Amino acid sequence: MSTTSCRMYENRFPEVDELVVVNVRQIQEMGAYVKLLEYDNIEGMVLLSELSRRRIRSVQKHIRVGRNEVVVVLRVDKEKGYIDLSKRRVSPEDVVKCEERFNKSKAVHSIMRHIAEKHNVPLETMYTTIGWPLYRKYGHAYDAFKLAISNPDHVFEGLEPPKSGVINDLLAQISRRLTPQPIKIRADVEVTCFGYEGINAIKAALKAAEDVHTEEVPIKVKLVAPPLYVLLTNALDKSLGLKKLEEAIGAIEKSITASNGTCTVKMKPKAVSETDELELADLMKKFEKENAEISGDEEDDQSGSE
């Protein structure tokens, strides 16, 4: 048996009405031949009549070779190995639900395959001794793996791994790959105050924003270049992070308007990528350099006038 290939689920064939993810291999007159990615690439067919509810003028508009599709199982002949599938009976909600399950199954499969190769154990043996029992107990092995990060003894209790060291290595892989990573969230605001309190009012408003922080959602305010400031946080819960930055902006607005100042939101709170972070760092360096050059010019002017 192979250490790299095996179906993801215990049943060798999908059930009728089950949603599955397929990869389109070729398109013929009868329909599209596909491989069921969760079932070790066994072959299935989507008849042309099951591609779309609308009249088909161009097959390529509905299905393309090489692309993954979510389809539903219509018929299964286990003896002959025939699997008939439909794309037109799949709703947008079905697609979201199926892709979510597939992504979880794919993550589990990658971890299981890594351990199987490392210990030279057939991948199917890994599934029969660990993977599928966890599917039965927890609904999905991915959910069991996530729970194992904090409570491994409870999750793996009663399992009989094929070799010693498998569970420890499995847990190490789970912790490395599935431990939640903080999401970087950012908002940009312009804060000005030309009233009597001026810069002190701005400082107080920015401090009010940082005071909104919690242990789960720390908040920092950084100057880019007056009057532009960025609000930054790292949060495991994206929605909570966004909500807290909204609250921080509200705190700025309340504080600064009390001093006859203004707060203008230039970018609403959003999750940012590494590229966004690098662009921000470059922008801040640029303004630091410009400020240093201005300071140098002022010093030269003062020394020249003496």
Curated annotation (Swiss-Prot):
The gene is tif211. The modification Phosphoserine is found at S52, S273, S295, S303, S305. Gene3D superfamilies: EIF_2_alpha, Nucleic acid-binding proteins, Translation initiation factor 2, subunit 1, domain 2. eIF-2 functions in the early steps of protein synthesis by forming a ternary complex with GTP and initiator tRNA. This complex binds to a 40S ribosomal subunit, followed by mRNA binding to form a 43S pre-initiation complex. Junction of the 60S ribosomal subunit to form the 80S initiation complex is preceded by hydrolysis of the GTP bound to eIF-2 and release of an eIF-2-GDP binary complex. In order for eIF-2 to recycle and catalyze another round of initiation, the GDP bound to eIF-2 must exchange with GTP by way of a reaction catalyzed by eIF2B. It holds the Pfam family EIF_2_alpha. Residues 17-88 form the S1 motif domain. The lineage of its organism: Eukaryota, Fungi, Dikarya, Ascomycota, Taphrinomycotina. GO terms for molecular function: guanyl nucleotide exchange factor inhibitor activity; methionyl-initiator methionine tRNA binding; protein-tRNA adaptor activity; ribosome binding; translation initiation factor activity. GO terms for cellular component: cytosol; eukaryotic 48S preinitiation complex; eukaryotic translation initiation factor 2 complex. This is Eukaryotic translation initiation factor 2 subunit alpha. The keyword Cell wall biogenesis/degradation does not apply. The keyword Protein biosynthesis applies. Eukaryotic translation initiation factor 2 eIF2 is a heterotrimeric complex composed of an alpha, a beta and a gamma subunit. It is found in: Cytoplasm, Cytosol. One of its GO terms (biological process) is cytoplasmic translational initiation. InterPro entries: NA-bd_OB-fold, S1_domain, S1_IF2_alpha, TIF2_asu_C, TIF2_asu_middle_sf, TIF_2_asu. It comes from the Eukaryota. The modification Phosphothreonine is found at T179.
